Swiss-Prot record:
Keywords: Amino-acid transport, Antiport, Cell inner membrane, Cell membrane, Membrane, Transmembrane, Transmembrane helix, Transport, Virulence. One of its GO terms (molecular function) is antiporter activity. Belongs to the amino acid-polyamine-organocation (APC) superfamily. Basic amino acid/polyamine antiporter (APA) (TC 2.A.3.2) family. The lineage of its organism: Bacteria, Pseudomonadati, Chlamydiota, Chlamydiia, Chlamydiales. The chain crosses the membrane at residues 12-32, 41-61, 85-105, 129-149, 161-181, 211-231, 242-262, 296-316, 341-361, 367-387, 418-438, 461-481. NCBIfam families: 2A0302 (TIGR00905). Catalyzes the exchange of L-arginine for agmatine. The arginine uptake by the bacterium in the macrophage may be a virulence factor against the host innate immune response. The keyword Transcription regulation does not apply. This is Arginine/agmatine antiporter. It comes from Chlamydia felis (strain Fe/C-56) (Chlamydophila felis). It comes from the Bacteria.
Length: 486
């Protein structure tokens, strides 16, 4: 029997968990938000996009908050909610897909870090896939591995400091753009209906809204950070508070960051600024020192988010293995109660993926799009479980959240999750199914060696495996015959 160390320490409070949520959501992409939003929409459509996204993500955030309160026994909820509600195979598949998603996402942080360094040391790290960039990224993969090995609490403390440090440049950006804000400029072509010599018509408000929401929907990936770490939280209440605090804080920052520049620069000017566009905006408004500050902030943001996701990504297989869904070897801890084997295996897979970046940038970009879609079923399954549990007689109606509230929160979160999956791209979803099917042998292996073989291989679980395998084969056929193209 493999020893998995002592009982998991519950030493993360609301602040540490909120730092995890904010840091996992606010990565390097936020420093490109002004240009990304202005590229296809006017200020009016951007406001509508944030309102709709904010409402949708509120229901997802509230889903996690409610579940942490009414089912505090289910730790690392992003995986456990799926397992509890829909059986071991769905739980495994959600955990497997989420794990793969974050492995590739972390390597994306490595690429972005090296590319950001190129601003200070051109041309050695250009594109993030040169030999110096691969070496630098590989070193950082293992540096973060050893930081987390020192202990989750210590890593979380470093992450809180990093979160504060990356919010400072963003706060300075908000203050400067607010200082230069002119309402007359902001109101100019508010709905994006005027063409210029360099900028064609943006189209209807509906088309602007659709293209802009493709940006906003990814802004909140990571909202589940506190839930994933709930096994190490001081209390279920801390998980709920951290999720809502992180969501609210990020939404405010996103809205201000994407709208305030419209008060000092016109839409076509913002759309033409090179990324990271926060640096370009400050270069125009205050000079080169502003550009340098934003590029430093970009580096801090990426590194801080990378640390957060290193903690989170190792926690998924560790937690899944503790109840037998992943191979038992993932449960091994070190003296600091960090998931040692899970960290080493995860970092090794990241290292392999980092080497692949050197050979094929285009294939890597496609892989990031595919794995980005793979996180969304976890949101859908969690919301669906809340709907299911709200109808259960065991639901604690005497608690702070009534079943009626839980039910309709879950329903609205389900609807928004389905929209996210659709907007993410059906072709990427098909490829994601292929990657999910690759986990089937690991599920079978875990089932054979676990105590719950009958449950793992019950008729309904075999049916689910068969459906995923069939869909994966169908996807391979569609791609090989070019009926669907990436």
């Amino acid at each position: 029997m493999i020893s998995n160390g002592s009982k998991t320490r519950k030493n993360l409070g609301a602040i540490a968990l909120a730092g995890m949520v904010i840091s996992s959501m606010i990565g390097g992409g936020i420093f490109s938000l002004p240009q990304n939003m202005a590229a296809s929409a006017g200020a009016g459509a951007i406001i509508l996009a944030w309102i709709l996204t904010g409402i949708g993500m509120f229901f997802i955030a509230n889903t996690f908050k409610i579940l942490s309160l009414v089912r505090p026994d289910l730790t690392t909820g992003i995986y456990m909610y799926s397992r509890e509600g829909f059986g071991p195979y769905v739980g495994f598949t959600i955990g497997w897909g989420y794990w793969l998603c974050q492995i590739f996402g972390n390597v994306g942080y490595a690429v972005m870090t090296m590319d950001a360094l190129n601003y200070f040391f051109p041309p050695y790290f250009k594109g993030g896939n040169t030999i110096p960039a691969i070496i630098g990224g590989s070193i950082l993969i293992w540096v973060f591995n050893f930081i987390v090995l020192k202990g989750i609490r210590q890593a979380s403390f470093i992450n809180v400091i990093g979160t504060i440090c990356k919010l400072i440049p963003l706060l300075i950006f908000i203050i400067i753009t607010a200082f230069f804000f002119k309402l007359a400029i902001f109101k100019t072509d508010f709905w994006g209906h005027t063409a210029t010599k360099t900028q064609p018509l943006l189209g209807s408000v509906t088309s602007q809204l659709k293209s802009t929401m493709l940006v906003t929907l990814w802004a909140f990936i990571g909202i589940e950070g506190a839930v994933v770490m709930s096994a190490r939280a001081k209390s279920p209440n801390a998980v709920g508070k951290a999720t809502i605090l992180g969501f609210s804080g990020c939404l405010i920052v996103y809205v201000l960051l994407s709208l305030l520049p419209f008060g000092s620069l016109f839409q076509h000017q913002l759309a033409g600024i090179a990324n990271p566009s926060t640096a370009g905006v400050l270069d125009i408004l205050v000079g080169r020192w502003g550009e340098i500050l934003m590029n430093i902030g970009l580096l801090i943001a990426i590194l801080s988010s990378w640390l957060s996701w290193t903690v989170i990504v190792a926690e998924i297989p560790y937690s899944a293995a503790k109840n037998g869904t992943f191979p038992e070897i993932f449960t091994i801890e070190n003296a600091a109660h960090s998931p040692k084997v899970s960290l080493y295996i995860t970092s090794a897979l990241m290292q392999v993926a980092m080497l692949l970046v050197y050979f094929s940038t285009n294939a890597w970009s496609t892989m990031l799009s595919i794995t980005g879609v793979m996180v969304l079923p976890a949101y859908l399954a969690s919301a669906a479980f809340l709907v299911k549990f709200s109808k259960d007689k065991k639901y604690p109606n005497k608690g702070p959240i009534k079943s009626f509230t839980a039910k309709y929160t879950g329903i609205l979160a389900v609807i928004y999750s389905i929209w996210l999956i659709y907007a993410g791209g059906i072709k990427y979803l098909f490829m994601a199914i292929v990657l999910l099917a690759l986990g089937i042998p690991f599920y079978i292996e875990a089932g054979k060696k676990g105590k719950n073989a009958k449950t793992f291989f019950a008729k309904k679980e075999v049916t689910k495996i068969t459906i995923i395998a069939f869909l994966a084969l169908l996807a391979i056929f569609l791609f090989s015959t070019e009926r669907i193209r990436l």
